[in-house]
C-alpha cells in the first residue's frame, strides 16, 4: 500500500519488494511484464523479458557460490540481472532509468559501470550470450569460485526457471 500512497522508499531486495507490494501483487506484476503481448500482436513471451528473467536467476545462482549464505547479495544479484535489459525494454538510457528508481547503490554501480562483484557477474552472464566462447575467459578469471561447468549448470537452471514462468501463465489468470 505504501507504493499506492506515493511514499518514497529504497527497495533493497526482492523480499523487500514483496513486503511492500505483497507477494501476490508482485507475482502478477512480474507475470504481466514477462508475458505481455508483443507489438506484432502475437501472443507469447517477449524474448527480452525472458532473457532478463534468465539473467536474474543465473546471477542469483552465481551469487550463492561467490558469497555463500548472503541473501542480500543474492537478491541484489537477481535485481542486477533482471534490470540489465531495461534500456532495451524501455528505450531509455540506464542512467535515466536508475534516476527514477530507488535501488541500492551497489546495484546502480553494477548496472552503470560493471563495478564490484555484481558488475563482474553481469559481465560474465553477458559473455555467455556471445558467440565467442573466449569471451568467458576474462570475467571467469576474476571470479575464482566459478568454473565453466558450474556456469553451464547455472545457465541450464536459469533458463528452466524462466521457461517455468511461462508455464505458470495459464494458472495465474485463474487465481
Ranges and model annotations:
Residues 1-175:
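Conserved alpha-helical "signature site"
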Amino acid at each position: 500500500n505504501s507504493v499506492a500512497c506515493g511514499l518514497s522508499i529504497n527497495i533493497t531486495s526482492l523480499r523487500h519488494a514483496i513486503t511492500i507490494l505483497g507477494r501476490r501483487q508482485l507475482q502478477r506484476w512480474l507475470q504481466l511484464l514477462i508475458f505481455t503481448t508483443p507489438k506484432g500482436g502475437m501472443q507469447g513471451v517477449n524474448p527480452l523479458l525472458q532473457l532478463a528473467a534468465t539473467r536474474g536467476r543465473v546471477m542469483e545462482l552465481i551469487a550463492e557460490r561467490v558469497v555463500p549464505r548472503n541473501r542480500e547479495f543474492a537478491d541484489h544479484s537477481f535485481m542486477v540481472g533482471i534490470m540489465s535489459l531495461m534500456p532495451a525494454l524501455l528505450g531509455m538510457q540506464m542512467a535515466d532509468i536508475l534516476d527514477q528508481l530507488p535501488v541500492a547503490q551497489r546495484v546502480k554501480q553494477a548496472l552503470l559501470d560493471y563495478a564490484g562483484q555484481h558488475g563482474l557477474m553481469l559481465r560474465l552472464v553477458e559473455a555467455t550470450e556471445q558467440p565467442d566462447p573466449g569471451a568467458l575467459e576474462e570475467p571467469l578469471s576474476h571470479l575464482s569460485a566459478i568454473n565453466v561447468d558450474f556456469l553451464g549448470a547455472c545457465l541450464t537452471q536459469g533458463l528452466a526457471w524462466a521457461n517455468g514462468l511461462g508455464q505458470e501463465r495459464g494458472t495465474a489468470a485463474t487465481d
